[in-house]
A protein has these predicted regions:
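Non-globular targeting/processing and membrane-anchoring segments
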Residues: 1-55, 80-81, 85, 99-108, ...
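Local sequence-structure signature of Cys/Sec-based thiol-disulfide redox active-site neighborhoods
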Residues: 46-77
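Thiol-based oxidoreductase modules, predominantly thioredoxin-like and allied folds used
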Residues: 58-61, 75, 83-98, 116-118
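Surface-exposed, flexible loop/turn segments at secondary-structure boundaries
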Residues: 65, 94, 121, 131
Length: 187
């Protein structure tokens, strides 16, 4: 956990409505997940308990990111149920913050959700994917031809097209994010 206060980043961020309005690429997918997502009674009880913490959050994201089209709407809905106000920052416009949250110490992978306590200090960090989604994409990438193969680019585009379709339409994928975030926030 960071002992750096992130209130200024929170204040700089966009609301969910403003972020969604700014989208060009994955707005339809994000909206579909947001509108169709459902929670169990157990989920709702956890979200209610979390609402007592008076947290807020900063999200590093970008419209072009397929993972964000899955994770942002799921976690926005969790935040709404948990009384956690999220603010959204575009990754490439906020590299000073992004570089504090590199995946595996090197990658500017997004989305990254930085949950802040009532004083603006980091309480939890989640992202960029649930372990199950990471395993799925790792397995799929392993099936790609070598990077210098003539059909690599075509096969890679097909892989990401299929991945984007699955994560924006399959409630089982949404559930992996719910469970992963729930475990992180309760911890």
């Amino acid at each position: 956990m960071s002992n750096v206060n992130h209130n200024s980043w929170f204040e700089k961020g966009m609301s969910f409505a403003a972020y969604k309005e700014s989208m060009d690429v994955n707005k339809e997918e994000l909206s579909r997940v947001y509108d169709q997502l459902t929670f169990t009674d157990e989920d709702l009880a956890v979200w209610k308990d979390l609402s007592q913490r008076n947290w807020k959050g900063v999200v590093l994201t970008a419209d072009w990111c397929g993972d964000a089209s899955l994770c942002v709407p799921v976690i926005q809905r969790i935040a709404e149920e948990s009384n956690i106000e999220l603010r959204f920052l575009i990754r490439d416009e906020n590299l000073e913050l992004m570089d504090q949250y590199l995946t595996n110490g090197t990658a500017r992978a997004i989305p990254i959700f930085i949950f802040l306590d009532q004083d603006g200090y980091e309480a939890r960090v989640w992202g960029p994917r649930s372990p199950e989604v990471q395993e799925m994409i790792t397995t799929a990438r392993a099936g790609l031809p070598a990077a210098d193969a003539p059909d690599f680019e075509e096969k890679q585009k097909e892989l990401y097209r299929n991945f984007k379709q699955q994560i924006s339409t399959d409630p089982a994928m949404w559930r992996t994010v719910i469970e992963s975030v729930k475990a992180k926030l309760q911890g």
